[in-house]
Amino acid sequence: MTVLHSVDFFPSGHSPVAIEPRLPQAAFPEHHHDFHEIVIVEHGTGIHVFNGQPYTISGGTVCFVRDHDRHMYEHTDNLCLTNVLYRSPDAFQFLSGLNQLLPQEKDGHYPSHWRVNQSTLQQVRQLVTQMEQAEENTESHALASRELTFMQLLVLLRRSSLVEGLENNDARLNQLMAWLEDHFAEEVSWETVADVFSLSLRTLHRQLKQHTGLTPQRYLNRLRLIKARHLLRHTDESVTDIAYRCGFGDSNHFSTLFRREFSWSPREIRQGRDASLQ
């Protein structure tokens, strides 16, 4: 597995933070780092495999990667990211207690993926630009300013994720997408889902297409197929059982959609035929 080292990314040994744009981010094999990073998805879509678990990401997704996490990107479509790198929560010269602003693992669950709305994303871009512009200055006041801006970023992300609520259509769509990640295997009535999240059906279709490039049903099918591929790789369950477990009522229809999405059949994935592409 590829290991990325801080010496190759941070401008100097004194720099607490480094900014790495990926415009766009191509598919990238599994790797980990000796530093931490916050991945901010600007726009586009892709699959983020995080510690073996697949997540569909799009504009507004924020992922917190620790130095022992492993991750990779697959099936990227104009996926544009900004990576905010930092050595560790305890490696800042002027800040302490940052762990309280970061997601915390509890009972074996690490809430690595957050979502923010477009308004917050604009504010995030401004803070990232401030840090990027001062990257080369190693004077104490400049380092302190960058650390303060980094803390502002954490506060903004945490506040936005906690109080987003149902304030506007953008926020409601974010909550809907998070709900689909957990309920992908259920039978979904888009009329009912739209009503639950206080969206008109037309708004749901339009906004999901803008965020992901996919219609609601195609987005749901992709979620199901991604989860199914993970089970094919990591369990011994039959193709039929996996199809039903992931929300498909017909295994033949599942196999057709699977090949169309990944260019491999479920059986070929089970046999590891795609291993060279992982």
Swiss-Prot record:
PROSITE patterns the record matches: HTH_ARAC_FAMILY_1, HTH_ARAC_FAMILY_2
Residue ranges: DNA binding: 191-212, 239-262
Lineage: superkingdom: Bacteria
Natural source organism: Enterobacter sp. (strain 638)
Subunit-structure text: Binds DNA as a dimer.
Domain HTH araC/xylS-type: 174-272
Residue(s) at site: Interaction with sigma-70: D241, D250
InterPro entries found in the cross-reference section: AraC-bd, AraC_XylS_family_regulators, Homeodomain-like_sf, HTH-like, HTH_AraC, HTH_AraC-typ_CS, RhaR_RhaS-like_N, RmlC-like_jellyroll
Descriptive protein name: HTH-type transcriptional activator RhaS
Lineage: Bacteria, Pseudomonadati, Pseudomonadota, Gammaproteobacteria, Enterobacterales
Pfam families per the UniProt record, alphabetical: AraC_binding, HTH_18
Entry annotated with the keyword Iron: no
Subcellular location(s) per record: Cytoplasm
GO MF annotation: an example: sequence-specific DNA binding
GO cellular component, as recorded: cytoplasm
Database matches in HAMAP family: HTH_type_RhaS
UniProt keyword DNA-binding, yes or no: yes
